[in-house]
A protein has these predicted regions:
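Hydrophobic beta-strand segments that make up the repeating blades of beta-propeller
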Residues: 1-5, 76-78
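Generic low-polarity alpha-helical segments
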Residues: 2, 30-32, 171
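Short glycine/acidic-enriched loop and turn motifs that connect beta-strands
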Residues: 5-9, 84-86
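Beta-propeller blade repeat segments, especially FG-GAP/WD-type strand-to-loop junctions
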Residues: 9-43, 98-100
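Intrinsically disordered, low-complexity segments enriched in polar/charged residues with Gly/Pro
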Residues: 16-18, 55, 83-86
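Blade-edge motifs of beta-propeller repeat domains
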Residues: 36-59
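Acidic, small-residue rich beta-repeat scaffolds with periodic aromatic anchors
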Residues: 60-199
Length: 199
């Protein structure tokens, strides 16, 4: 992950939240070993969110605060977390899974968990883009064990989706889950600025 270093994009914040907001753009690049060096196989310059957001100054860095990027056996996972120090009890974590196939990193799955910090009420969702199926689990609690009888699992078939890749033409952000269709019931995901970057 690369990040622009422009001092003008580190903005002072006089209100609630972080005292300074780093709005420098990030990009993600993926390189594979080739001979004695490496070759660039994918990149995206606008998908990853910046560390700070002037519209949500209480938002912690989505990538560095419990977020992560890992790659193993041709599978890349990018996790983004959403935690606000003010204005919301909600917390969410979104993990995007890409697989190296046909010389591109294809988005094959998405997993999301969201919970309330005050009650612990939790919802988990998972989408398999290869099968077009979504799993939704409700009734769980982040802070305590819940009897299995109270956990509800629902499976749904989503409308056909075009293949999406790390290097474009476009990647979904949480806003897009609502447009997947009313059956998807994904309207509660937290919003963030969709920025493209390539690995």
């Amino acid at each position: 992950v690369l990040q622009q270093q422009d001092a003008a994009k580190i903005v002072a914040n006089d209100g609630l939240g972080n005292p300074t907001l780093d709005t420098n753009q990030r990009q993600i690049k993926v390189l594979l070993r080739q001979g004695a060096g490496y070759r660039l196989v994918a990149e995206n310059r606008s998908w990853l969110p910046s560390a700070g957001d002037v519209d949500m100054p209480c938002l912690a860095d989505p990538l560095l605060d419990e977020g992560s990027i890992e790659i193993n056996r041709g599978v890349l996972k990018v996790s983004l977390s959403y935690w606000l120090s003010c204005g919301s009890w909600g917390v969410s974590r979104d993990t995007y899974t890409f697989r190296w196939q046909q010389n591109r990193l294809r988005l094959i799955g998405w997993d999301g968990v969201e919970f309330m910090r005050n009650s612990g009420d939790m919802t988990e969702r998972s989408i398999n883009y290869l099968t077009g199926r979504q799993k939704t689990v409700t009734g769980g609690n982040m802070f305590e064990d819940v009897p299995a009888a109270k956990i509800k699992t629902r499976w749904q078939t989503l409308p056909p989706q075009p293949a999406r890749y790390l290097d474009g033409p476009s990647l979904p952000s949480p806003q897009d889950w609502e447009s997947v269709g009313a059956n998807a019931d994904c309207s509660q995901f937290h919003l963030y600025k969709n920025k493209e970057s390539n690995t």
